[in-house]
Amino acid sequence: MNAEYGVGARLPAKTSLIVIRRRRGTSPQCWTHKSKESCMPTKETSNSRRGSAATKKNAFCSFCRKSYRDVGPLVEGPGDVYICAECIDLCQSILDQEQRRRGPSKSLFSDIPSPRSIVEHLDNYVIGQGSAKRVLAVAVHNHYKRLSNGADGSNGEVEIEKSNILLAGPTGSGKTLLARSLARMLNVPFAIGDATTLTEAGYVGEDVENLLLKLLHAADFDVEAAQRGILYIDEVDKIGSTNGNVSITRDVSGEGVQQSLLKMLEGTVANVPPQGGRKHPEQQYIQLDTSNILFICGGTFVGIEEIIRRRLGHRTLGFGEGANVRNEQTPGELVAQVQTEDILKFGLIPELVGRMPVISYLQPLDLEGLIQVLTEPKNSLVKQYQALFAMENCELEFTEEALHAIAKKAVDKGVGARGLRGIMEDVMLDIMYDLPEQEAGKVYTIDEAIVTGKQDLFKMPTTKSA
C-alpha cells in the first residue's frame, strides 16, 4: 500500500480502507477511501446505508478475528473480508523473510581482509596468542579468497581445498573468543556447538546435523549465507579416548561421533532437521552444502603434555652426572611443539585429524596477560564496570595492586581469562549493592585491600541504637 494509506502497499481497485469512528450520541460511521485526495463518506441509499452500518458495526479482521475496536482501521476486500494493520505487517514480514530465503544472497566480500588486518582486529579483543592469531588469519584469508574466486573454490584446472582449523589450549585461553571475533569482523553467520552432546545415530542425544541447525538459526535460515559461515565445535577432545583402551561397553559419544563428523567437515550435502532432534520424523529437511563452511574445532586436550614429552624423549642420553635425568620442560614449552601424531595418540582418529590440517595451540595466560585482559580489550571487565559506575554519575578506578590481586586469584584457581568475570563479580558484589545510595559525582578507587576483603569501599552508615 502507498504511504498515504499507512499500510505499505497499493490497494486493489475493489479494496477499500474503512475507518469506523463513533461520534458522541451517534452510531458508528463508515468512511471509504476512494482516492488519495478524497476521504468523504460514500453516497448510499437509506436501505443500503442501514445494512452497511449494521455490517460495518460488527466488522472484524478475517485473519486474527479481532474487532475493529481492538485493532483500529480495517482494510476491506471483496466478499466482506477484512484485514487489520497488525496482520498486514505480519504478512509483509513473512513475505520478506521468504524472499530473502529464496532470493540470491549478497556477494561475500568486496575486499577480503588481509592476514595482517585480521590479526590487528583480533588484537582488539584477544590478548596474546600471537602465533595462533597468525595461523587463523592466514587460514581464514585463504578460505574466503577461495570462495570469492568461485563457489567451488576452483581456478581453472586447480581446485583449492578448504583448510579446517583445530585450536588446542587450556580453558580461558581465548579459543572461543578468537572464533567469535573472526566472525564479527567478516560479518558471516557464526554458531557454537558442543561435541559432548553428540551421539551416534540411533542413540539418545543430538545428531551432528544439529550443529548445522545452529548455523542456520544464526543465518536466519538463509541457506546461501549459512553455507559460507563459520561453525565452532567446542570440546572436540572429549569425543576421543585419552588412553586408547577399548571399553567393554559401546562408546556412543566417542569414535562413532568422530566418524559422523568426517563427511560434514570434508564437505557434503547434509539433511538438516529444521525443528531439531529426532522427535519430529515427519518434518521436511533442509539441504545444506558444507563444502564452503569453515569448521573450527577447539579443545583443552588435558594431558597432551606427557604425550609430547614421551615423543621428544623425557630422559637424556649418555654417561656421567647428567645421565638418566628427566628433561624438565614447562607445559607451555611442550605444547608449543604439538604435532599431528600427538593428537592421534590422544584419541582422535586419523581421518578426523586429516580433515583439520591447520593445528594451533594456545598458550595459557600468565599473570601479566590476565592483567592485560582486565584492562586492554574494547569490552574489558574494567571498562564494563566503569560504564556501570558512569550510569550512576560516578567514576571508578583500579590500582595496579588491585588488578594484580585479581589476576593472581585467577592464576591460583587455574581458570584462565574465563574465570576473571567470576572473581570480579565476587569483588564488586557489595560495592554494586551500595552504589545507588552513594553520592553522585565522586571518584571511587579499588585497591588491593578491597580486593582481598580487608577493607570496604563505602563507609557503612552507623545505625542508631534504641
UniProtKB/Swiss-Prot annotation:
Component of the ClpX-ClpP complex. Forms a hexameric ring that, in the presence of ATP, binds to fourteen ClpP subunits assembled into a disk-like structure with a central cavity, resembling the structure of eukaryotic proteasomes. Coiled coil: none annotated. Residues 49-103 form the ClpX-type ZB domain. HAMAP family: ClpX. SMART domains: AAA, ClpB_D2-small, zf-C4_ClpX. GO terms for molecular function: ATP binding; ATP hydrolysis activity; ATP-dependent protein folding chaperone; protein dimerization activity; unfolded protein binding; zinc ion binding. Belongs to the ClpX chaperone family. Keywords: ATP-binding, Chaperone, Metal-binding, Nucleotide-binding, Zinc. Zn(2+) binds at residues 61, 64, 84, 87. Pfam families: AAA_2, ClpB_D2-small, zf-C4_ClpX. The keyword Zinc applies. ATP-dependent specificity component of the Clp protease. It directs the protease to specific substrates. Can perform chaperone functions in the absence of ClpP. One of its GO terms (biological process) is cell division. ATP binds at residues 170-177. InterPro entries: AAA+_ATPase, ATP-dep_Clp_protease_ClpX, ATPase_AAA_core, Clp_ATPase_C, Clp_protease_ATP-bd_su_ClpX, ClpX_bact, P-loop_NTPase, Znf_CppX_C4. One of its GO terms (cellular component) is HslUV protease complex. This is ATP-dependent Clp protease ATP-binding subunit ClpX.
